[in-house]
C-alpha cells in the first residue's frame, strides 16, 4: 500500500505554513498568515490547534480528548477517549486526555458541566460518538480529495484514510498538515450520521491502559480537595461525641 507523502499539496490556500488542526464542536478564532499569492490579502486560518468542546486533532497525529466531567477515580476520561477513538478510528497510542476548567461557553455548548449519579458515560456516549463519526467523515472526504479518490471508495482505520481500490493511504496528521477543516458540526449532521455497529467495535469493550493513571499514582492529579484560594481557611464541623448528644 502506498503512503502519500506529506509534502504533497492539493489544497493550495489552506496549506500555507503547514499549521492546521481539526476543531470539533466549536468554531475557533482566526489567525493570519501571509498570502504568498497576494501579500496584501492575508489568509485566514484557525489558530493552531485551538481547544474544542469535545476533542482537538493535530497535524502531529496526536488527538486530545477534552473531558468536561469531574474525575473522581472512576476513569471517565479514559472511557470518553475510548468512545471518541472508536468512532473516529484513532490510533489509541496517540490519544491523550485533559480536564478543562469550567467555562461559560462550554456550558452553553454542552448544556451542563457536572458529575453525579454515575451518568457521565450514559449521558455522553451518544453525543461523543456522533461528533466523532461526523469528524471521521470530514477526514475521509478531505483525505480522498488529496488521494484523488472518491470518498465512497475510502474508509478510515487506525488514524489513516485508506483507498483499497488504488492501494494507497494517507494519515490523519498528513491530511491536517495539508488542509484546514474548520467546520462547525450542525445538529442535522449529528442526527443523520451513521454510527458503527457494536460487533465492529475495536476499542470499546477491550482492556485499555487508563490514560491518566500516572498522575493519579504519583500525586500530580488535582482533585477538589486540593483547591487553594488566597486567604483560605480550614473549618471543621463540631459535633457531639455521642449519637444523641446535646445540640451545640
Can you say where each PLM-predicted feature lies in the sequence?
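Cofactor-binding beta-sheet edge motifs in enzyme active sites
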Residues: 2-24, 31-248
